[in-house]
Amino acid sequence: MTRSVAHMMATGSLGAVFLVVTMDHADGQTRTTARPTLGRIERLDPRLDSIVAPDAKMEIIGNGFDWTEGPLWVKADGGQLLFSDIPPNRILSWQQGRGTQIYLEQSGYLGPIPRPNNIAPDEPGSNALALDPQGRLVLCQHGNRQVARMDAPLSKPKAKYIPIADRYEGKRLNSPNDLVYSKDGSLYFTDPPYGLTRKMEDPDKQLDFQGVYRVGKDGQVALLTKELSRPNGIAFSPDQKTLYVANSDAARAIWMAYDVKPDGTIANGRVFFDATSWVGPEKKGLPDGMKVDTQGHLFATGPGGVHVFDKDAKHLGTFVTGEATSNCAFGEDGSTLFITADMYVLRLRLKVKGTGF
């Protein structure tokens, strides 16, 4: 979701900030430090206790950014978290004991910023990040209006890109937002208008819809659905028989579920959960990025924070951040959830593991 939309939804935030003791490991040394924390955990079902401990806190591991998105855990070289900061057009990295550093400039747009005639704040940078089956960095690029692969090793990042998807039936995509790979190597992604300088009114908008797409191993871009007004976050169930898609529209703030057919297309679209009634000044944000654990729980960012659902759409609880919350990702040993929430990057220890670990 775009930062400007998120900030229109509400003002104010949770003021309580606590301290939690953590263990940092740097240069072989172990030391105890205190980290500030943010928000609270709202428990709506006793089953949430098997997912997150009663005393768990959301640690602030980074702050002061413009609009964070697209967290991705990279296991190589001791492990690091990559995440996008969209308005300044960059990716940052975080490592335990090292903190946050700039990883890549011009991550979503190779031209000058701010772009002319933009509706402030301009959001030209990368959004969601992923690793392809070969372990290469793949980016949803707002300004370049494409899904692209970085043409450089992860250890030596460069603003050099190879397009994977930039057009559909000869027309330029809007601004790819989120993506996920299937087990067979196919790429699924969403394409709302948030990265366009004038959003829906942009004169350079060539498609008259916002789509969900699949790129098969043959490289062809196939439209899966154009029924959603603002398709955004996207994730698979553990068995990849269900595809979840968030719709970041205040008038229809929903998460959809689709059956995935053997040929990779989708069918039987239905509303998984409707959060439209949550939208308002008390809860910042809209349905956005999401991830799934190995037990099938859906961790879906949306109004108020990160909402935890079981596979039957039962709402178990919410990690209430008090900020517009854009995305999340599992990392470290798989039982840590990293959360991007406006200017913050948060870390929450869980009792479950995400898929892929």
Residue ranges and their predicted role:
Residues 29-357:
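Sequence-structural signature of mature extracellular/luminal beta-sheet repeat domains
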Residues 7-8, 260:
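Generic cytosolic/nucleocytoplasmic N-terminal low-complexity/intrinsically disordered segments
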